[in-house]
Amino acid sequence: MKRICEWAMALLFSGVLLVLMAATILLPKNRYSYYENRNLSAFPEITPESVLSGQVFDDLETLFCDYAAWRTPALKAVTWADLNVFRRPVVNETVVTDDVLLPQLYDPAMSDDDIRAQANLVAEDNAALQKQVESYGGHYCYVAVPCQYVYYEDSSPAYLTNRSRYTDLELSALTEEMNAQGVCFLDMGPVFDSLGHPPEFSSRVDNHYGLRGAYETYRAAVQALNDAYGLALSFPEEGADVTFSALPNPYMGSRTRKLMGLRGNDEKLLTAAFREDIPFTRLDNWQEVASAVYALPATEDEALTYGLYMGGDIAETCIRTTAPRSPPPSSSVTASPTPWRASPITASTRCALSTCGTIRRRASATISPPISPTSSSASAITRRSSRAATTAASPDFKQGGLL
């Protein structure tokens, strides 16, 4: 009897493996993983070198893991168990609290002197960029916007790091260096605090700030430009010039997706509507596309991602308006320190934004009404943009960049 049981178990195990392998090979494949927000592995290139080094076998293992049959339901089941059975505080690199989903953080391996040295380098780079922008007749303002884990710093469990010391030291060092270099600098942290630090200014489930946060950032930046350069830029007032409305669709923020949609899907995204239509043309990577700033879904039940705004991350977007009250084109650019988001502002239209951000990647965008807190990246601190209203530098690792 024991021998029969052993044979039965071996046959059952072999049968399950055979079914899984057959299903993995035969079922339709999708290169994109929605919940992980990444492309799955491609079939590796087989060369004598990759075979001898063993790399091809590692790549094949990754490939089979990525395309394993019923992989998504299995991941969802494991995530559900971690959330509801084991009640882990950190699941899939996401800190789970009652009110907000935050990234799992680690203290950077940087000394205080390293932080100050980086701040000095960034300030020097931005001072040179400001001088270049002003030589074109433009206007420059560096806006530091708190990213999500800074905005919800107090929501992080006490037994996990929230980088508060690093954030405080970095911001104070950057502020001091920017002021010493004469850079027009705006810290949105105190501005948000003066407005009551409402949760709608920053997403609770994503590393982006909300449309109202973008609106208040733009208001403060316009005022900073007016004060610094003696301008008279106008601003669309809520109620009179612009109204916000929430879309009924469920919102799948990046951290919600990390949790397979099992937590944090009650947040709603906003859109802005202006009292007066402002005609504009849009160019993505210098190719003209449809004049739209929202990638609206077909139905109210379709889940939204942050790609609602501008259709997602695009290397370069330029929006040109012909608004009669627009001042002559002039420019400004910003970047941000590590836990703060970049928010470059252009003064070329009544309501335009130019975005930049993370070190090691480079892009730019100019956005005009309707307001969109879109995202893009900027150049490394050792590079300088030769074009006004494009990119600036950030000393950050992953968290820099406008949301």
What kind of feature is each model-predicted range?
Residues 1-403:
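Extracellular glycan-modifying ectodomains
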